[in-house]
Amino acid sequence: MPTEGSTVDTLTIEEAAAELARLAKEIAHHDALYHGKDQPEISDADYDALKRRNDALEVRFPELIREDSPSRHVGAAPSVTFSPVVHARPMLSLDNTFSQEDVQDFVAGVYRFLGRLPDQSIAFTAEPKIDGLSMSIRYENGRLVTAATRGDGTTGENVTANIRTIAEIPNELPKGVPAVVEIRGEVYMAKSDFLALNRQMEAEGKQTYVNPRNTAAGSLRQLDAKVTASRKLKFFAYAWGEMSEMPADTQFGMVQTFKDWGFPVNPLMKRLNSVADILAHYDEIGLERPDLDYDIDGVVYKVDSLELQARLGFRSRSPRWATAHKFPAEQAFTIVENIDIQVGRTGALTPVARLTPITVGGVVVTNATLHNADYIQGIGNSGERIRDDEHDIRIGDTVIVQRAGDVIPQVLDVVMEKRPAEARPYEFPKTCPVCGSHAVRERHEKTGKLDSVTRCTGGFICRAQATEHLKHFVSRNAFDIEGLGSKQIDFFFENEDASLQIRTAPDIFTLEKRQQQSLTKLENIDGFGKVSVGKLYGAIDERRSIALHRFIYALGIRHVGETTAKLLARSYGTYEAFETAMREAEALSGDAWNDLNAIEGIGEVVARAIVEFYKEPRNVEVITRLLEEVTPEEAEQPKTAGSPVAGKTVVFTGSLEKLTRDEAKARAESLGAKVAGSVSKKTDIVVAGPGAGSKLDKARELGVQTMDEDQWLALISG
């Protein structure tokens, strides 16, 4: 993680510009994982450190503030799975505070901005910050008409059908409410319901969920509303968007009105009149936190008077009248009993610390990721020191373990005073512990730097990679085959009977046929039965036709997650077109290669990984056999009858003045256009704003149609 504060002043303008560029990309990556995929890979504390570093650099170098700066944007672009909803009023994020001094500064800033003296009391509300999914629910004439996620703050995802299944959210409001009401709040899953769901998943041999927040978000994004209904989601109302008339003149009064209208509101919300009272309530909520049946990660403070809120106004992405006081990351001390190596489906060797059990934040922690060989030595991904030189992690060490934001626990540091005399430096394996193949750290072709990850070179001869690949193939967001969980995959993979073996994905779809010709019947084996085997065969047959993006994601191509798979499916339309293009791009040059790199959201690293995947004969052979059993469907395109840009490839460049870049992209895609990140022969339109540079030049050189923002808006408004 970056260091903060004093080092900012020592940077040159070139160093600051380079770091701001890196931070913009890194924070956008984490925003997409958290808001778009509900799969955070760093803790809230580490994310906040990145944001603070970015803010500190922008204060010191205001001339370097970027168009894509995290300080200008909220969240991440909405998913392409659900139709976009443009919020009538933006759903902004809150600034964070981390200490009593920060809170005192926030309150003092409110008084200063309003020209109030300390003896002229200003009331604040204080309420728990729910760790769930932000939601905006619109009612017209008392009836629920639309529900949308936060998305990027301007445009969210339409999840109306799923929201209607949440019992705590009324479909109709009492008589006499304003004609237009937008209720905003948090959808969450109770801890007790989360534990019950995981027990059910375990009993069914399925993969369990990571935490309530991600589970709630994933449940809300189900295409089948019946699945959402089965998840027992809950809701707290705490804010509003568009209102045709205001039923109260204070924050507290508005929330109490929501309660009167039938919405659940948090019972721990209070109205307070001093910093001392605010901080005391923060401590009270912190003490209650372990006993609450829902996750919280801080306390939100808001100026109570709506008149004063209006006077205070907003910064670019947050209100001046509110802040979120975050809880510190939860830490504990324990002992490293052993270090094991896990091998993933891409061959990554990940060290895991086996710990003396310790309770952190109400959860018993027995394992913690050590990430890679460098992390064990105290070196971060960027090559910087993250611990003192001698603070490498050894078996027998007493370590500080942190669990923040429900991310996998991590070892922060070593307590050197308690290091046993016999503790020896950990030697990272040079061979795969599963198959014995050589384990290497790849060197980046352009930078010459070693990858932080050590990988097994065994490929599919490595049992760990093969089984993990199969588990990925049948996972929830890939083929999602009910009855084929982790335990079942291990059983079929290790079986010596040819009629029961599943070693590659095509074997799944030939299982029933092989069983019909065998004397060894699956239904006679412990753990199975006639009914469950019948259901398994039925579940397999249901997946003989599958959405294109799920098929691509299931292949397990390195760097290709769900979002990237959807981009590829939308861009190529059919699997045949996709595979043909990847083969044509084999030389990493030419039109097919350029077209792949031009897809918005696909960079050279991802593009290279996809092409390399198709250059491997073993992969092509497995896919060929798979296509004999499975039919990938054509990608569903937006309904764009009469759209002047349907099917066209559009590139936006320069500064847009009437739309944000995300808005422009969402509008174009909703009309059936494909948005690319670079100009090629296949580009149809380049929309150029002030500051357009090389992309505009290339468009003119290739004879591509160019227009300004006003011409674009006129074209799509028709």
UniProtKB/Swiss-Prot annotation:
The active site is at 129 (n6-amp-lysine intermediate). NAD(+) binds at residues 44-48, 93-94, 127, 150, 186, 302, 326. Keywords: DNA damage, DNA repair, DNA replication, Ligase, Magnesium, Manganese, Metal-binding, NAD, Zinc. GO terms for cellular component: cytosol. It catalyses: NAD(+) + (deoxyribonucleotide)n-3'-hydroxyl + 5'-phospho-(deoxyribonucleotide)m = (deoxyribonucleotide)n+m + AMP + beta-nicotinamide D-nucleotide. InterPro entries: BRCT_dom, BRCT_dom_sf, DisA/LigA_HHH, DNA_ligase, DNA_ligase_AS, DNA_ligase_CS, DNAligase_adenylation, DNAligase_N. Zn(2+) binds at residues 432, 435, 456, 462. The keyword Disulfide bond does not apply. GO terms for biological process: DNA repair; DNA replication. DNA ligase that catalyzes the formation of phosphodiester linkages between 5'-phosphoryl and 3'-hydroxyl groups in double-stranded DNA using NAD as a coenzyme and as the energy source for the reaction. It is essential for DNA replication and repair of damaged DNA. Belongs to the NAD-dependent DNA ligase family. LigA subfamily. This is DNA ligase. The lineage of its organism: Bacteria, Pseudomonadati, Pseudomonadota, Alphaproteobacteria, Hyphomicrobiales.
